[in-house]
A protein has these predicted regions:
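C-terminal and inter-domain tail/linker signature
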Residues: 1-182
Length: 182
């Protein structure tokens, strides 16, 4: 099996999407029958034509201009990269892959994102992208967290700062276990 530089291919893929905004360069990093699935919204596609259409009209040029991806961790295997990051942006445009059909709210959003990228013959074959959609909806004002075990921006901040308090959503239960034998 050839030793492909997965990190270089992955970094070029991300650069093509988020910096160069170049659909053709993005597609050049992928195998012809690649699959992309933004899991919470089931957006993406399978195969060259469907993915090129998705990237051209619903992804590459539709990010808010202030989007920032903050790396948290990366695990590299023989044919897989798992990237953990925090995405920060202001919801100033329709973002089809993240909030399909939701008009801009002007609100700030910070969300942890995990991407599982699989490679085949030195090119990207599959991306599964995960984030907490409830947190996004709370942050843009479309979901009231009252009485629900969900949080807004706090989840991203906790990923970036492990010293922030844990167990806030189960405060009563946490307090009830205080002083018990461990």
């Amino acid at each position: 099996m050839p030793n492909h530089d997965l990190i270089a291919v992955w970094e070029e893929h991300l650069r093509s999407e988020f910096v160069a905004h170049d659909v053709d360069a993005t597609m050049d990093t992928m195998v012809p029958d690649a699959c992309v699935n933004h899991v919470p919204t089931m957006t993406g596609g399978v195969g060259h034509d469907e993915l090129k259409r998705f990237y051209r009209y619903h992804f590459v040029d539709v990010h808010p201009p202030d989007i920032e991806l903050i790396p948290v961790s990366r695990t590299v295997g023989t044919d897989t990269i798992v990237d953990e990051m925090v995405a920060k942006f202001t919801h100033t445009c329709v973002i089809d892959h993240l909030l399909p059909g939701i008009p801009p709210t002007g609100r700030s959003v910070e969300i942890p994102v995990v991407v599982v990228a699989q490679f085949q013959d030195g090119k990207l074959a599959s991306e599964h992208i995960y984030w907490d959609q409830a947190s996004v909806l709370v942050q843009i004002g479309k979901l009231d967290p009252a009485g629900l075990p969900i949080a807004g921006v706090e989840i991203a901040r906790k990923v970036l700062d492990r010293t922030l308090p844990s167990n806030r959503l189960m405060a009563r239960e946490w307090q009830g276990s205080e002083g018990k034998p461990i």
